[in-house]
Amino acid sequence: MTSLLKSSPGRRRGGDVESGKSEHADSDSDTFYIPSKNASIERLQQWRKAALVLNASRRFRYTLDLKKEQETREMRQKIRSHAHALLAANRFMDMGRESGVEKTTGPATPAGDFGITPEQLVIMSKDHNSGALEQYGGTQGLANLLKTNPEKGISGDDDDLLKRKTIYGSNTYPRKKGKGFLRFLWDACHDLTLIILMVAAVASLALGIKTEGIKEGWYDGGSIAFAVILVIVVTAVSDYKQSLQFQNLNDEKRNIHLEVLRGGRRVEISIYDIVVGDVIPLNIGNQVPADGVLISGHSLALDESSMTGESKIVNKDANKDPFLMSGCKVADGNGSMLVTGVGVNTEWGLLMASISEDNGEETPLQVRLNGVATFIGSIGLAVAAAVLVILLTRYFTGHTKDNNGGPQFVKGKTKVGHVIDDVVKVLTVAVTIVVVAVPEGLPLAVTLTLAYSMRKMMADKALVRRLSACETMGSATTICSDKTGTLTLNQMTVVESYAGGKKTDTEQLPATITSLVVEGISQNTTGSIFVPEGGGDLEYSGSPTEKAILGWGVKLGMNFETARSQSSILHAFPFNSEKKRGGVAVKTADGEVHVHWKGASEIVLASCRSYIDEDGNVAPMTDDKASFFKNGINDMAGRTLRCVALAFRTYEAEKVPTGEELSKWVLPEDDLILLAIVGIKDPCRPGVKDSVVLCQNAGVKVRMVTGDNVQTARAIALECGILSSDADLSEPTLIEGKSFREMTDAERDKISDKISVMGRSSPNDKLLLVQSLRRQGHVVAVTGDGTNDAPALHEADIGLAMGIAGTEVAKESSDIIILDDNFASVVKVVRWGRSVYANIQKFIQFQLTVNVAALVINVVAAISSGDVPLTAVQLLWVNLIMDTLGALALATEPPTDHLMGRPPVGRKEPLITNIMWRNLLIQAIYQVSVLLTLNFRGISILGLEHEVHEHATRVKNTIIFNAFVLCQAFNEFNARKPDEKNIFKGVIKNRLFMGIIVITLVLQVIIVEFLGKFASTTKLNWKQWLICVGIGVISWPLALVGKFIPVPAAPISNKLKVLKFWGKKKNSSGEGSL
């Protein structure tokens, strides 16, 4: 596996920008390259300046509008400045109030059934007016005015929700309208080549009507004009459809789901369905979904940088600073809030309304393809200019013949009108060569395949937040995966327990231990239990671990509400992924203070100095007893159980801080008394082992990075196939986060490639691993769900956040959200990533074949005979097949298992591989040879010698045009499978591909048989049709024979200095395959 990764083309080389080495040198030498993440505006501007801008409106129509991006940033900054000014003003007013200057607020006026108007709420929330809140009776009084219960929320029935939305508004904001179809139509008209063709068409139309009359004279100019209009309409329709598709995907990205309290139970709703009066639980990583006031909280701290631009973390207090701004993130602690403002009645709503039009995104592949288009376009321009000069020279020197064999131009005799008409036709041919030569379909193909892939990935439970992640995922060489919920089902149940100094029945503990365990479970939790009024099963909320422990508490006889009412929380330390534990201090009914801790078993056990024995007495934690518990932990962990310990200690009530000091109190975590250790079963997901094997066969190493015990991680890794039964299970294959953390960067770099499992890791350990792997040249994908995973998700080449267990902070730092938290979905993302790249390569092979063939045929014919067999209208039709229909057919190929049998795609590898060069040259040489032979010897070969010369020439040119188009149609089948011999595999299942082929053929028949005057064709008999079909079909066996021709290992592109932007030079181990 290691050797496979070392030779993989997906690995970064020494000078790769993505590895962070020699960035400036590399970027300077490759204009058409941008980083896959966080490209600077300057870098994005640089490649545009280098691109061929003859037809900029089409070239850049699928790229980021840099001017609009700058305007968006400025608008965001203005609104942030406004929010910042409001906060400063609020602090000033707070100081004034403290000095005795009290701001008065008028009495609340009724608003429907509620006791406060929307205007009053908006003024209070936006000004952070504590005085107004006090006048309304504080948070409880405000809740009464809004007819909500701080502990149970609103009733949540349809009538209540409708009233609240009617009076206070909904949590939505007006979206700026995207570009309409007419705008896309107008943009398509700005293509300079099409404008020149349209001018030529108008001139030809006017001259034709003048010389031949309206009945016959409109054909040439009218045909070109119609063809140009058709290209414009098809381009606009395609662009408009893609715009709608991306808009729908953007809507899905913004649709956050969260829990609210309604009718006493926690229910999950869309952020758009939040109403004023809702009570919302807040936990680390959540986004504050609306403006509101804090009801209660423990160590609650917010990151308000999204609104104020300041990265400072702000502590929130229900008494002193209760106002919460929509859009901020919960950085620490937990609490619950009462919603007071939604939608445009919030600063965040105003911000989103002002920038809600998504401005697209640049992807590295789009930029590289623009580099390809620039090079080919330059050749096309040179060829077109040469053809123009040659045709004009031949015409004015009398070498261009008319239908009677005489010179078309005779100095002093040919009328000026005829000269202008002939020159316009020559110009039209030259411009049309540019239209066909410049492969504008390449950016369209990227957009099509990305849009198609993103839509299909949604069905595969993956929501793409950043387009370039689709491409980058195809290059991934390693995946650092979480265990819980990704490799396992996240359906946890307590199945074993140690308490009273021995292994016990999970449902029967000594009475003394039971009472303390129930107290700890009910208070030291962010979950809850809802008891339906009409009876029925209990409803648990919270994380899977919390649910499992709450369920265990119920089996022990716990009544959740009763247990919570018997003590009150003084202070809480929410679970911390660094410390691997969370604690709470409670005051019991008899005035005692208990500090309860819950967390990773061996970490909590290490803090215990005693335990409660089976008689309910506190006994010292001897070495023997500590070893007994440790062996129990190892035994459970070795059987894939997740081990959690519960402990407590008493604390002197008089030493408990009060006032402001209470919020800063660090709960004591030493001298603990062990209550119980439980083993929680979290089964492996079905099929995850097959997914891991699929990754390994594809050259992608899967590594498990988990906060669980090393032994639990080892057992799960063996079950999932990450570790083989005969693998070396010592360091560094199996390593603990602490050991890795204490190493130097150099030491980490030596072993990081060998790590398969990292247990008891913190989010920072994951970040260190990602950084080390990237330094080693890996393209790293990372899964994460917690707020503290954000740095690793951001640092990785592809950050994958969990959609179910993931916090909003993690999701916002990610590139792709895995909606079902399933590792199998991660593997599907890898398949789609490879499919994006493969589909683009298929289209490049197809399009370049057409480019080369059309250019050579017209150039050779123009130089030798002064005429071209493929007319302007015919070339525009070919352009339509190539740019739009071809892109649609080849860019929407679904991924195949064949893709997962290859090593990862190298992001800096040549786009045109040796296999593609071989395939396209074989087809292009064949087409050029056959069609030029027909051009020069067609009349005799086809037996047309006895026909009228003009008719014979027209039949010959029609056969050339027809055969050329059919060659492209049949060659689309070859392009589907560039390196496979069976080009028909799975073709019937791809209905879109077959539909486009049928449409192309039907339209071609119509053009040849019924639109002769429009397309300069004539009807063909069945024998002539058979010849055309035969010429096209031969491309199939020719492609098959060609696939037996070996290709060199070193990419041809490396030897061609002029093609440097098609890929960076590979090392000697690089392959010329996809």
From Swiss-Prot:
* Domain observations: The N-terminus contains an autoinhibitory calmodulin-binding domain, which binds calmodulin in a calcium-dependent fashion.
- Please give, as recorded in its UniProt entry, the membrane topology of this protein: Multi-pass membrane protein
> Gene3D superfamilies under this entry?
1.20.5.170, Calcium-transporting ATPase, cytoplasmic domain N (3.40.1110.10), Calcium-transporting ATPase, cytoplasmic transduction domain A (2.70.150.10), Calcium-transporting ATPase, transmembrane domain (1.20.1110.10), HAD superfamily/HAD-like (3.40.50.1000)
Encoding gene per record:
ACA8
Region Interaction with calmodulin: which residues? 43-54
Q: Where in the cell?
A: Cell membrane
Q: What is this protein called?
A: Calcium-transporting ATPase 8, plasma membrane-type
Query: Extracellular side: which ranges?
Result: 202-219, 390-426, 860-870, 935-949, 1012-1021
CDD domains, per this entry?
P-type_ATPase_Ca_PMCA-like
**What is the enzyme's main class?**
translocase
Q: Which reaction does it catalyse?
A: Ca(2+)(in) + ATP + H2O = Ca(2+)(out) + ADP + phosphate + H(+)
The residues exposed to the Cytoplasmic compartment are: 1-180, 241-369, 445-840, 892-911, 972-989, 1044-1074
**Pfam name, any one:** CaATP_NAI
